[in-house]
Design a protein with these regions (language model features):
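Redox cofactor-anchoring modules in respiratory/redox and cofactor-processing assemblies
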Residues: 1-188
Length: 188
């Protein structure tokens, strides 16, 4: 990598497929090989390379924010699950996470999308793989960062309001909500 940076991880196929650690980069880029590393598949093959100076908490909260923002809100497990994942990831990223939050995130992934086909679209299925793999594969790093938190910062974060997915600065727009088409007075 440029500047003598080291690879921390690679998301090989768009954010929904999950993450490979630096130690897993010798896997083949085919569907069967990446599945052995807990990934959903190859997705769009739009690779994202994360270097060693990137805080894993930032990766986690950005992924959670993306999926919470993209949820249309029609399916309960997606609307509630992505919202909860964002709240927990945001708490961790802002320096007030708990070890139990890591377990909560993994539990949420099992409750909202590990059985494909239970929602209108595939968004909850795609949301769980990156969260699950980031937490599981970088757990030691998360635990170390949580252990280094200042108790005062934890109190400050608890007092702050966590923004909803709609208030977050992604494209500066709210997600489109499904609405019933209007009908004319003539019934046409």
């Amino acid at each position: 990598m440029a500047g003598d940076r080291k690879v921390k991880g690679v998301i090989p196929g768009g954010v929904s497929v999950g993450i490979l650690t630096a130690d897993e980069l010798d896997c083949g880029l085919d569907f069967d090989d990446v599945r052995k590393y807990g990934l959903l598949g190859l997705g769009t093959a739009g690779a994202i390379v994360i270097d060693d100076r990137t805080d894993i908490r930032t990766v986690l909260v950005n992924v959670a924010r993306f999926f919470a923002h993209e949820s249309c809100g029609q399916c309960t497990q997606c609307r509630e699950g992505t919202g909860w994942m964002l709240k927990v990831a945001d708490r961790i990223a802002r320096g007030a996470g708990r070890i139990a939050d890591l377990d909560l995130l993994v539990e949420l992934t099992f409750n909202m999308g590990m059985m494909p086909g239970l929602s209108i679209c595939g968004l909850p299925d795609g949301a769980v793989y990156p969260i699950k793999t980031i937490v599981q594969k970088y757990r030691a790093e998360f635990e170390s960062l949580i252990a280094q938190q200042s108790p005062q910062r934890v109190v400050e974060v608890i007092k702050e309001k966590t923004p909803s997915a709609y208030e977050l600065p992604i494209l500066g727009q709210r997600p489109v909500q499904a609405t019933r088409p209007a009908t004319s007075a003539t019934g046409a």
